[in-house]
């Protein structure tokens, strides 16, 4: 599986990156290796079109309903990482299930500089960590469906992504909290850990996006041996 960073900072090298991806995909096609290629992005037109149909009051109501749903979930289940951001999308560019005509057509479109000007396909932010979590949750399905013994996971990106949000907001990963002790406010240090229920390994997590990237990559490696 390959992930491609579809962010604005990649604009100068995106065409060359796509060409590299096409070469890798062609190799996989020749030797019949199952593969999928995704672009991760904060931009996609379907959601924007949906938003454009709503007036400001409707958008606010929808946001409040979603916020309340997560608050109720947090009350039931405690603090957890929330990766269901409206600003995270995965676009499947290539796969081993494509026909030769489909593959060649997509290749021509992607290397055309005008492709990025299509509505919904402009580059945006870098939801790197969210895309890694998606891989962590779904890589096993890909391995099982294709009866794969050894998997290679490639990420083509130029920088760090945004930090995770949690059911408690960004404060859910703060390294300290305020409590009243003997009638006085005191700052209490705290640490956060995430546990893989399959490997039973535990990882320390902070608000630092780079640390988060490293943690999820280690979780992917430990669970799937990639």
What are the language-model segments listed below?
Residues 1-226:
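Acidic, glycine-rich A-domain
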